[in-house]
């Protein structure tokens, strides 16, 4: 099969993308210019404190904040541009300039973020996509042993129940607290819960856990996220002290961390923080709530060229469709295998129904479609179908990358 028109080229122009961001594109993210933060965003953020941090490893005691005003600006942009009318979810890659870096950190090379945002997706595939894409980006930068720390604070009611029990626990044990622990409790009970002080950590061993207060819906959501991690063989631990900013965070909170220093948390490097913020749109007065989740990665601007700008990317010649829960669990493995072979796909992982997936990707008119159903998931294979002749081959996952390389070469005639 050849391109029907000579106007169809192998590469398509792109803006606001760098080399490390190209990895996100393979997972369905679209690069955009980061929304400008305006006065109304800052005003809306005044009552919401800084809550999530990514450690700056060149400043052992320094931290780079992730401001809620950025999420607010993103929500405003979603509404202003009527992204709700687009195929959902909206997956975005934001290539930001230096954010929150101090003068001292600039001496060591500027620190920059890679932001991944998914708007309009409530299912656990959103968390799994962010974690898988984030780890792939960090691995490209040389971080080969990235683990996941994860927790859930549930919905608003779950968090309220947990908060009451946590404060009650600390009050009952206040006589056993060190001055440092008491000072943290005076400031905020959750500051005490997140403390790395040895005396505070000893106290927190028996503290209530947010997961024990989850609603049935929140508990099931977390279990499904963990099922993805296990299927993808991503190492993870439950971190009960991972709470985030309770003013806007909901449900899942996770961190991408250096797996080497698991035994000594005080020396552990945090490469990224991911949070859900499902209720933020309503809180900002928007008519309809927007299910939101984002991951911010701290990327070094070192001697490599990962931050070099890309002007074009490969045009996908295939779409990917998954049918059933078993294939959905394996879908990210399929994408990662093809990403390594530099085979891009059009996909819509957050949609469950076949009709919704097809309507989302059919506008691209790809000459091939890759299908994974329940049978294929069990057999670790896919069906590769030609859309003009409806001929198809069953291809094992082990041979898929090699097969698609040949298909791509034949299609472009090179």
Q: How should these model regions be labeled?
A:
Residues 1-414:
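TRNA-recognition modules of translation machinery and tRNA-sensing kinases, especially anticodon-binding
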């Amino acid at each position: 099969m050849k391109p029907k028109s000579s106007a169809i080229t192998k590469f398509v122009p792109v803006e606001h993308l760098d080399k490390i961001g190209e990895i996100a594109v393979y997972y369905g993210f679209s690069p955009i210019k980061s929304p400008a933060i305006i006065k109304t965003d800052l005003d809306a953020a005044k009552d919401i404190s800084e809550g999530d941090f990514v450690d700056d490893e060149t400043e052992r005691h320094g931290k780079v904040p992730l401001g809620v005003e950025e999420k607010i600006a993103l929500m405003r942009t979603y509404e202003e541009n009527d992204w709700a009318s687009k195929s959902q979810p909206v997956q975005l890659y934001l290539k930001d300039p230096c954010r929150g870096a101090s003068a001292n950190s600039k001496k060591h090379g500027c620190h920059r973020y890679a932001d991944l945002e998914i708007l309009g997706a409530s299912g656990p595939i959103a968390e799994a996509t962010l974690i898988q894409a984030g780890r792939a980006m960090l691995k490209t930068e040389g971080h080969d042993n990235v683990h996941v720390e994860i927790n859930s604070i549930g919905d608003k009611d779950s968090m309220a129940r947990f908060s009451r029990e946590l404060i009650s626990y600390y009050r009952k044990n206040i006589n056993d607290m060190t001055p440092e622990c008491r000072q943290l409790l005076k400031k905020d009970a959750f500051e005490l819960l997140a403390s790395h002080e040895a005396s505070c950590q000893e106290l927190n061993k028996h503290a209530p856990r947010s997961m024990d207060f989850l609603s049935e819906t929140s508990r099931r959501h977390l279990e499904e996220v963990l099922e993805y991690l296990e299927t993808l063989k991503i190492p993870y631990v439950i971190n009960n002290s991972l709470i985030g900013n309770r003013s806007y965070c909901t449900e899942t909170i996770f961190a991408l961390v250096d797996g080497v220093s698991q035994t000594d948390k005080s020396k552990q490097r945090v490469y990224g923080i991911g949070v859900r913020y499902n209720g933020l749109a309503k809180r900002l007065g928007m008519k309809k709530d927007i299910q939101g989740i984002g991951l911010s990665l701290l990327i070094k601007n070192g001697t490599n060229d990962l931050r070099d700008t890309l002007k074009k990317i490969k045009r996908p010649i295939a779409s990917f469709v998954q049918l059933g829960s078993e294939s959905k669990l394996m879908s990210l493995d399929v994408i990662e295998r093809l990403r390594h072979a530099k085979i891009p796909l059009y996909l819509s992982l957050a949609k469950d129904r076949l009709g919704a997936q097809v309507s989302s990707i059919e506008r691209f008119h790809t000459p091939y479609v890759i299908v994974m159903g329940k049978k294929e998931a069990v057999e670790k294979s896919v069906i590769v179908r030609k859309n003009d002749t409806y001929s198809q081959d069953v291809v094992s996952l082990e041979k898929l990358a090699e097969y698609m390389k040949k298909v791509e070469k034949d299609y472009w005639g090179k």
